[in-house]
């Protein structure tokens, strides 16, 4: 019997089973113990293969692919700390709902806890963060192939959102020519190999029913809060709120067009808060809200009912309102709960939003971080997409810009870490093949610098704007101790990114005014290549401009 040959047949069943559940993208890191999985993926024509040498970046690449494709994405890594590097992407997927299938190769049981090289306790290592976990046995013909395929099918059928961790131990030898070992075992699955359906089909219904009293609540004074959702859902939510006559507070990731722009500014005005207190119901569609003032208002508002609608399970309301947690796709929920045409009840806030917007526009000519956030809609590629980093940049865009309705916007706003942002953006671009604008801060870029390797080959223009404010300037917005701020919070690195771009053979520009930026962008959108644009800005101007605008708008 050939151990290596049967390892490959065992792995081939696993990978083929994944194709029956919509898996098309497979992300692979180099490794020896994962050889059976890697070869099975490489030999399966149903897959699009992606490779990366860094497992942490690989996990985030898969995350980006899943965000756009809305299908599960598989990841293959070898044993040991390679597995641990998937943790950040796994956590993010659990909070934002993307489906990741993590296939982690492992040593066989007799090599665990005995000093064997590259052998750690992988089973259950991710604690409660995966939505599903599956620890497979060592490949053996004593276990029928139908057990293996039905076990994979069951785990995937139960995966509503988040990650499925499948731990796969393989014994040596891992290499060798294929022979007939296990062929009969494999053939017992019959014509399943030529079929396109799962071996085991399970129906799992997870969607909230129609709220029978909706006809009553839609006649009340309501507020719509729009969080993270798809571009198509964003347009539908905007129309739905407009028909109801309810004010829509749109997050930067809502893709609703933010009909009341600068919400994070005008929510700091007491007049706005007073008017919103008249709301009898708040309907929040989507989670992961960004704006600080929005979160403060959400925490203190007390409507009669607070509904949260999202396709992700679990509680998504940190303020713990009395109301309803409805698990459903937003588009499906809107269809079950049609709007009734009514006049707007909230008349003061639209004027406040207009005045706040005018204050922002008045400062747009200065070359700076806050002004870039405001102008970002002018720089979006036609029929393209936007990826927004975390920390200060996403808050500035949320507060100061107004993105077009239905324009695709992506970000990692689940755990909101700055790790893996470039890798995620690379996955977003690969899944869509659209022109992509990504914007991150300098520390975020440094954190994921080797992901520039993923951007060397792109299928459409990719522009990475690195806003270099020399450190974590978001801490300038917080009451951090002044004497300790620079060393222990901001951590300025005093670096530029021209050499990094050159190392990976990427185009690079460092504009010093808006005209130079616009010229660099115009050239970048004409070429299917990656262009790094570094905006070196005053360290504190972005945070200070936001604080000044907040003060101005609070007194309108």
From Swiss-Prot:
GO terms for molecular function: 2-succinyl-5-enolpyruvyl-6-hydroxy-3-cyclohexene-1-carboxylic-acid synthase activity; magnesium ion binding; manganese ion binding; thiamine pyrophosphate binding. InterPro entries: MenaQ_synth_MenD, MenD_middle, THDP-binding, Thiamin_PyroP_enz_TPP-bd_dom, TPP_enzyme_TPP-bd. It catalyses: isochorismate + 2-oxoglutarate + H(+) = 5-enolpyruvoyl-6-hydroxy-2-succinyl-cyclohex-3-ene-1-carboxylate + CO2. Keywords: Magnesium, Manganese, Menaquinone biosynthesis, Metal-binding, Thiamine pyrophosphate, Transferase. It is an enzyme of class 2 (transferase). Its cofactor is Mg(2+); Mn(2+); thiamine diphosphate. One of its GO terms (biological process) is menaquinone biosynthetic process. Its EC number is 2.2.1.9. Binds 1 thiamine pyrophosphate per subunit. It comes from the Bacteria. Pathway: Quinol/quinone metabolism; 1,4-dihydroxy-2-naphthoate biosynthesis; 1,4-dihydroxy-2-naphthoate from chorismate: step 2/7; Quinol/quinone metabolism; menaquinone biosynthesis. NCBIfam families: menD. Catalyzes the thiamine diphosphate-dependent decarboxylation of 2-oxoglutarate and the subsequent addition of the resulting succinic semialdehyde-thiamine pyrophosphate anion to isochorismate to yield 2-succinyl-5-enolpyruvyl-6-hydroxy-3-cyclohexene-1-carboxylate (SEPHCHC). Belongs to the TPP enzyme family. MenD subfamily. Homodimer. This is 2-succinyl-5-enolpyruvyl-6-hydroxy-3-cyclohexene-1-carboxylate synthase. It comes from Salmonella paratyphi A (strain AKU_12601). The gene is menD.
């Amino acid at each position: 019997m050939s151990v290596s040959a049967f390892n490959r047949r065992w792995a081939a069943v696993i990978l083929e089973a994944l194709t029956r559940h919509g898996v098309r993208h497979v992300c692979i890191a180099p490794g020896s113990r994962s050889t059976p999985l890697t070869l099975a993926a490489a030999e399966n024509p149903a897959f699009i293969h992606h490779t990366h040498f860094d497992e942490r970046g690989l996990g985030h690449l898969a995350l980006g692919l899943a965000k756009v494709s809305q299908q599960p994405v598989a990841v293959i890594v070898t044993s040991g700390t390679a597995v641990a590097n998937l943790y950040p992407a796994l956590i993010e997927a659990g909070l934002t709902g993307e489906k990741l299938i993590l296939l982690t190769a492992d040593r066989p049981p007799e090599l665990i806890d005995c000093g064997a090289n590259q052998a750690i306790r992988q089973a259950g290592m991710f604690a409660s963060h995966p939505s599903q976990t599956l620890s497979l046995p060592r490949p053996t013909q004593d276990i029928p192939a139908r057990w293996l395929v039905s076990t994979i099918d069951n785990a995937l059928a139960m995966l509503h959102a988040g990650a499925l961790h499948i731990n796969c131990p393989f014994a040596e030898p891992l290499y060798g020519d294929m022979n007939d070992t296990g062929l009969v075992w494999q053939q017992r699955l019959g014509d399943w190999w030529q079929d396109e359906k799962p071996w085991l089909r399970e129906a799992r219904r997870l969607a909230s029913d129609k709220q029978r009293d909706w006809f009553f609540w839609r006649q009340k004074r309501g507020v719509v809060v729009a969080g993270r959702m798809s571009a198509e859902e964003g347009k539908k939510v905007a129309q739905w709120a407009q028909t109801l006559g309810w004010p829509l507070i749109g997050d930067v990731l809502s893709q609703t067009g933010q009909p009341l722009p600068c919400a994070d500014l005008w929510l700091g005005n007491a007049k706005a808060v007073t008017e919103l207190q008249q709301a009898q119901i708040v309907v929040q569609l989507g989670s992961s809200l960004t704006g600080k003032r929005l979160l403060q208002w959400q925490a203190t508002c007390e409507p009669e009912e607070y509904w949260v609608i999202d396709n992700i399970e679990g509680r998504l309301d940190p303020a713990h309102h009395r109301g309803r947690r409805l698990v459903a796709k937003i588009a499906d929920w809107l269809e079950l709960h049609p709007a009734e045409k009514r006049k707007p009840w909230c008349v003061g806030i639209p004027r406040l939003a207009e005045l706040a917007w005018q204050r922002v526009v008045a400062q747009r000519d200065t070359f700076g971080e806050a002004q870039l956030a405001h102008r970002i809609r002018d720089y979006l590629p036609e029929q393209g997409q936007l990826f927004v980093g975390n920390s200060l940049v996403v808050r500035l865009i949320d507060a100061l810009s107004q993105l077009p309705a239905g324009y695709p916007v992506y970000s990692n706003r689940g755990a909101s870490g700055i790790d893996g942002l470039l890798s995620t953006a690379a996955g977003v671009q690969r899944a869509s093949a659209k022109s992509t604008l990504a914007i991150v801060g300098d520390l975020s870029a440094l954190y994921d610098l080797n992901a520039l390797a993923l951007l060397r080959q792109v299928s459409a223009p990719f522009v990475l704007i690195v806003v270099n404010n020399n450190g974590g300037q978001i801490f300038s917005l917080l009451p951090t101790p002044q004497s300790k701020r620079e060393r222990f919070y901001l951590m300025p690195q005093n670096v530029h990114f021209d050499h990094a771009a050159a190392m990976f053979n990427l185009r690079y520009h460092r504009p010093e005014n808006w005209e130079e930026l616009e010229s660099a962008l115009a050239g970048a959108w004409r070429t299917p290549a990656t262009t790094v644009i570094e905006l070196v800005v005053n360290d504190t101007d972005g945070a200070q401009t936001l604080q000044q605008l907040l003060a101005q708008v609070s007194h309108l």
